[in-house]
Swiss-Prot record:
The gene is CAP1. The modification Phosphotyrosine is found at residue 14. Homodimer. Binds actin monomers. GO terms for cellular component: cytoplasm; plasma membrane. Residues 43-71, 91-129 are annotated as: Disordered. Its main location: membrane. This is Adenylyl cyclase-associated protein 1. It is found in: Cell membrane. It comes from Sus scrofa. InterPro entries: Adenylate_cyclase-assoc_CAP (IPR001837), Adenylate_cyclase-assoc_CAP_C (IPR013912), CAP/MinC_C (IPR016098), CAP_C_sf (IPR036223). It is a peripheral membrane protein.
Length: 233
């Protein structure tokens, strides 16, 4: 506080000398500064900081609780601390008076947990025009497409993603297209020996041709092709 007071007195001296030399509006500003410093000094002399430094009491602190010794004395009472509790009669108890419990209003239950429904399984896919659609099938070993017509012509059966096996009966297959497949076995009947097999980005493919005895002869499909330029193509 003494340092602040000394600095303000020094500013008074320099401010007065500068104001006299310059004059004009500077005198008005100097008077405003002097007034502000005077008010600061008046407040500083009677403020809480000055009282603390001078040793004067600054007033009791609000909300002061009982001393810690009284709290520990209550804790060490043990079972006798319950003697101060008031006895509650039966007619004042809520669980023995259903009427009072009903007046308190219904208890709101929280939202029920959401349970996602599992996708259904369509054991018999329905045809869409000339295409059959099988979806949401899991662990189904007897998936059969039976809603068909005999002697179908210009029909297309397209299968995407993974599949274990597929059988096509009573159809003459003119072409089989396989793309991005690994480990495929194609069984051809006697009526489909003239079909064309087109494969791309596939490996481990075998074509099985029926024999007179009912068995099949296995022929691998080449995974690599050799191209030779003959001068024109």
């Amino acid at each position: 506080l003494e340092a602040v007071s000394h600095a303000s007195d020094t500013h008074y001296g320099y401010g007065d000398s500068a104001a006299k030399e310059i004059g004009g509006d500077v005198l008005k500003h100097a008077e405003m500064v002097h007034t502000g410093l005077k008010e600061y000094k008046d407040v500083d002399k009677x403020g809480p900081v000055a009282k603390e430094l001078s040793g004067l009491p600054s007033g009791p602190s609000a909300g002061s609780g009982p001393p810690p010794s009284a709290l520990f004395a209550q804790i060490h009472q043990g079972e006798s601390i319950t003697h101060a509790l008031k006895h509650v009669a039966d007619d004042e108890k809520t669980h023995k008076n259903p009427a009072d419990k009903a007046q308190s209003g219904p208890v709101r239950x929280g939202p029920k947990p959401f349970s996602a429904s599992k996708p259904g399984i369509s054991p018999s896919p329905k045809p869409v025009t000339k295409k059959w659609r099988x979806e949401n099938x899991e662990n189904v070993s007897n998936l059969v497409i039976d809603d068909t017509e005999l002697k179908s012509v210009n029909s297309t059966l397209q299968i995407k993603x993974x599949i274990n096996s597929i059988s096509v009966d009573n159809y003459k297959v003119p072409x089989i297209s396989i793309n991005k497949x690994d480990g495929r076995h194609i069984y051809l009947s006697k009526n489909s020996l003239d079909c064309e097999i087109v494969s791309a980005k596939s490996s481990e493919m075998n074509v099985l041709i029926p024999t007179e005895g009912g068995d099949f002869n296995e022929f691998p499909v080449p995974e690599q092709x050799k191209x030779i330029w003959n001068g024109q193509k």
